[in-house]
Amino acid sequence: MNEVKESLRSIEQKYKLFQQQQFTFIAALEHCRENAHDKIRPISSIEQVQSYMEHYCNNSTDRRILLMFMDICSELNKLCQHFEALHSGTPVTNSLLEKCKTLVSQSNDLSILRAKYPHDVVNHLSCDEARNHYGGVVSLIPIVLDLMKEWIAHSEKLPRKVLQHGTT
């Protein structure tokens, strides 16, 4: 369990760095959307961000911030697998884990996702951006981090036997 907590802390630190550069991230997505002639559709999946990065990203600053987003998503995905291996779960932890796995899936539609208070990532966007283009993609990481913290909190309340059973 300590290893999982440490992994989550590490991801949170990377996210804090990423969050400080949200305007750079939005600008990078905007540049890629322009290059792709795709200004109408919202950013709706991790897969779409990856495609933009691979095919429509023209400068190192944009590539770096998009890669940072992709790396955090990849680490969240790996942590989901680590959670799964830790114990067989309860209905509550299994539900939280399924939500996490769905959210970090490459093709999951993020367009309607919106982080709520205390997260202010959506508030930093203009109304048009928040409503139409980037609200989902900037909400993904804080929502998944919250679900993972909740999973850990519920898992720590389980009897030791349940936790040990999952590792044998």
Swiss-Prot record:
From the UniProt record, give one GO term of the biological process aspect: axoneme assembly
Q: Which UniProt keywords apply?
A: Cell projection, Cilium, Cytoplasm, Cytoplasmic vesicle, Cytoskeleton, Flagellum, Nucleus
Source organism per entry reads Rattus norvegicus
Q: What does this protein do?
A: Microtubule inner protein (MIP) part of the dynein-decorated doublet microtubules (DMTs) of multiciliated respiratory cells and the distal singlet microtubules of monoflagellated spermatozoa. Forms an extensive interaction network cross-linking the lumen of axonemal doublet microtubules.
Q: Name one GO cellular component term.
A: axonemal microtubule
Q: How does it assemble?
A: Microtubule inner protein component of sperm flagellar doublet microtubules. Interacts with CABP1 and CALR. Interacts with INCA1. Interacts with microtubules.
Q: Quote the PANTHER family the UniProt record gives.
A: SPERM ACROSOME-ASSOCIATED PROTEIN 9
Q: A single GO molecular function, which one?
A: microtubule binding
Residues at site: Essential for interaction with INCA1? Y117, H119
Keyword Plastid tagged: no
The entry's protein name is: Sperm acrosome-associated protein 9
